[in-house]
Amino acid sequence: MLDSLQERGWWKGQRLELNLDDELCQIANCLGQPIGARRRRSIVEVLKPMSADLAYANSLSAQYQLSSFPFHVDTAHWPTPCKYIVMGCKSPGSCDRKTLLIDWKSLQLDDSDMNVLKNAVFLVKDGARSFYSSIISDNNDFIRYDIGCMYATGPDSKIALKILSSAFRKSVKIEIKWEEDDILVLDNWRILHGRSRSSDPMSMNEPRELHRVLVK
C-alpha cells in the first residue's frame, strides 16, 4: 500500500478479516492520526448520495445533491487539509456511481499557470473560521482546491479556475468502480477526486454507501 501511495498517490484493495469500519481505522492509524471531518462527530463518516434537505449545510452534497461532484480535495476549508482519505464500500448501490481521480502531477500546467495558481487569492469559507488562501504555495506540499468552499476574489482567481478547468478536461481520469468491501486510500495532497453521474439520475432510492476516515 505505501509503495502504491508513494508511486501513484492512491491504493485500492479489499477488506480482509476485520469488519469494514475497524479495517478503515486500522489503515488510518498506520498512516497517521485519524480525525473526524466534523467536530464532535465519529471518526468514521457515512457517505451517501442525498438531497439538499438531508445534507450538511454548505457541503458538496447540499450543493450538488444526487448529481456528479466536481473534482476537489477533502477538507480544503481546514488550515492544512487532511493528508490521506481512507474509504470503504459498504454497498455499491445499483446506479453505477464511480469515484473519479485526477493526479495533480499529471496535469499539463506550465510555469505561467503555476504562477497564477500560487498567487491568485481565494476566500475559503468556514463560518467564523474563514480565511484567504491560494490553491498552491511554495511553502506547502498540499493542494487546496474545492469550489464548494473556495470563492474567487478577483480577476486572477477567476483565471486560476479557468486554468484548472481546462487542465481537468484534458487530463486522464482514473475510474474507481466500487464493489462491496473495496477499500480506497488517497493521498489528499496529490489526488483530486470527484463523483460520476448516476446511471439512473431520476432514482431517489440509491443505496450506495461509502464509509470514510480522514488522516492528518
Language-model segments: residues:
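Short secondary-structure junctions
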Residues: G32-R38
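A structured, charge-rich N-terminal accessory region that forms the first stable segment of a protein
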Residues: Q14-L16, L24, P34
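Active-site environment of non-heme Fe oxygenases that use a 2-His-1-carboxylate facial triad
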Residues: M1-W10, L16-L18, S42-K216
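Glycine-rich, aromatic-bearing surface loops/beta-hairpins
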Residues: C25, R39-S42
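N-terminal functional module of multi-domain proteins
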Residues: G9, Q26-G32
